[in-house]
C-alpha cells in the first residue's frame, strides 16, 4: 500500500527520484499514465494488469468509455528506475501534469500520484476545507 507525501525535484532531462518508501513495492519497472485532476498515476505492473482487465469490460459502444480508454492508455508508459531510484518522465506526461522542476509524490492506496508542487498545494488547500463533508457523504467509517 502506498501512503505519504514527498517533495522531489525534476532535473533538466525530466528525471525524478522515486521516494525510497515506494521503490520496493513499485519494483524496477512500473507504469505511469495520465491521471485525473492534472496529475500522473503510477501503478505496479500487477495493479496495471488488474486495471486493464476492468477497463476491457467497458462497452465499446459508449463514446465516453472509448474516450477515457484512449486518453488513459495512449498516455501510459512503462518506466524503469535506474540505480539511483530515478525515473524519466516523458515530455507528453510532463506537459499534461504541468511538471517543471518541483514535484510532489503522494501515495494513494494502490497507486502513486505525481503532481506539480504548486498544483498539489492548490488542490490540497481547496480540498482540505471539504475533507470532513466529503468523508461524511462517501464513507461510513463505523468507528
Curated annotation (Swiss-Prot):
PROSITE patterns on file: SPOVT_ABRB
GO MF, one example: DNA-binding transcription factor activity
InterPro entries with a match to the protein in the record: MraZ (IPR003444), MraZ_C (IPR035644), MraZ_dom (IPR020603), MraZ_N (IPR035642), MraZ_sf (IPR038619), SpoVT-AbrB_dom (IPR007159), SpoVT-AbrB_sf (IPR037914)
GO cellular component terms, A-Z: cytoplasm; nucleoid
One protein family per Pfam: MraZ
Main location: cytoplasm
Keyword terms of this UniProt record: Cytoplasm, DNA-binding, Repeat, Transcription, Transcription regulation
GO biological process: negative regulation of DNA-templated transcription initiation
Compartments where found: Cytoplasm, Nucleoid
Transmembrane segments: none
Record bears the keyword DNA-binding: yes
CDD domains named among the record's database cross-references: MraZ_C, MraZ_N
Domain SpoVT-AbrB: 5-47, 76-119
Stated family: Belongs to the MraZ family.
Subunit-level organization: Forms oligomers.
Protein name in the entry: Transcriptional regulator MraZ
Gene (name only): mraZ
Amino acid at each position: 500500500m502506498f501512503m505519504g507525501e514527498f517533495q522531489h525535484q525534476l532535473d533538466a532531462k525530466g528525471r525524478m527520484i522515486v521516494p525510497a518508501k515506494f521503490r520496493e513495492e513499485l519494483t524496477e519497472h512500473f507504469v505511469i499514465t495520465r491521471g485525473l485532476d492534472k496529475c500522473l498515476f503510477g501503478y505496479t505492473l500487477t495493479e496495471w494488469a488488474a486495471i486493464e482487465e476492468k477497463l476491457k469490460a467497458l462497452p465499446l459502444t459508449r463514446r465516453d468509455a472509448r474516450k477515457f480508454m484512449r486518453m488513459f492508455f495512449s498516455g501510459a508508459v512503462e518506466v524503469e528506475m535506474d540505480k539511483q531510484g530515478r525515473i524519466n518522465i516523458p515530455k507528453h506526461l510532463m506537459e499534461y501534469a504541468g511538471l517543471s522542476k518541483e514535484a510532489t509524490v503522494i501515495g494513494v492506496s494502490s497507486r502513486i500520484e505525481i503532481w506539480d508542487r504548486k498544483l498539489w498545494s492548490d488542490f490540497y488547500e481547496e480540498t482540505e476545507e471539504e475533507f470532513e463533508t466529503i468523508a461524511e457523504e462517501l464513507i461510513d467509517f463505523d468507528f
